[in-house]
From Swiss-Prot:
Its cofactor is Mn(2+); Mg(2+). One of its GO terms (cellular component) is cytoplasm. This is Ribonuclease HII. A divalent metal cation binds at D7, E8, D99. It comes from the Bacteria. One of its GO terms (biological process) is mismatch repair. Belongs to the RNase HII family. Its EC number is 3.1.26.4. It comes from Francisella tularensis subsp. tularensis (strain SCHU S4 / Schu 4).
Length: 187
């Protein structure tokens, strides 16, 4: 059975897109060390990212913008990204395994698996692709807006990030529907 593993990164941050990735692994090309991206060092994630995009049978990465997140809400934006991932790889898999407890509204043979990124290697691989891709976006944001410190906090609502929003203002890359950003917009 050919499995498509799907996971996302970036639901909690105040800025940047939510990213979903899907991976179909080549059973003849074993990638050692696949695990939940949150449990790996940045260096290990980068190394595995390269191995996954080189050796996977197929993969895709989808971004949903902060503006779309504000329009839809984060759950619907995440489900939309996952749906797009499956559509991008349509007819290449027999079953979809998604990390978490919610599935998009689709007709694919699928299952949501809580902590799937720690249990299913295809989901682990998707977790790594989504996390590294999103982290790279944050590094680009840091290059464009160095005073905000995106390389350090990756958009999460740290004290430093909130202070920098207060000091320098809300950017287009910020999610304006998120309460901490709304509060700062209304000050």
């Amino acid at each position: 059975m050919i499995i498509l593993g799907i996971d996302e990164a970036g639901r909690g941050p105040l800025s940047g897109p939510v990213v979903a990735a899907g991976v179909i692994l080549d059973q003849d090309k074993i990638i050692d060390g696949l695990a939940d991206s949150k449990k790996l060092t940045e260096k290990k994630r980068q190394s595995l990212y390269q191995q996954i995009i080189t050796h996977a049978k197929a993969y895709t990465i989808v971004e949903i913008s902060p503006q779309q997140i504000d329009e839809l809400n984060i759950l619907q934006a995440t489900l939309k990204a996952m749906h797009q991932v499956a559509n991008n790889l349509e007819r290449q898999f027999d079953k979809v395994l998604v990390d978490g407890n919610k599935l998009p509204n689709w007709d694919y043979n699928s299952e949501a698996i809580v902590k799937g990124d720690s249990k299913i290697i295809e989901i682990s691989a998707a977790s790594i692709l989504a996390k590294v891709h999103r982290d790279n976006i944050c590094l680009e944001h840091d290059r464009l807006y160095p005073q905000y410190g995106f390389a350090k906090h990756k958009g999460y609502p740290t004290k430093e990030h909130l202070e920098n929003i207060k000091k320098y203002g809300v950017l287009d890359i910020h999610r304006k529907s998120y309460k901490p950003v709304q509060v700062l917009l209304n000050e």
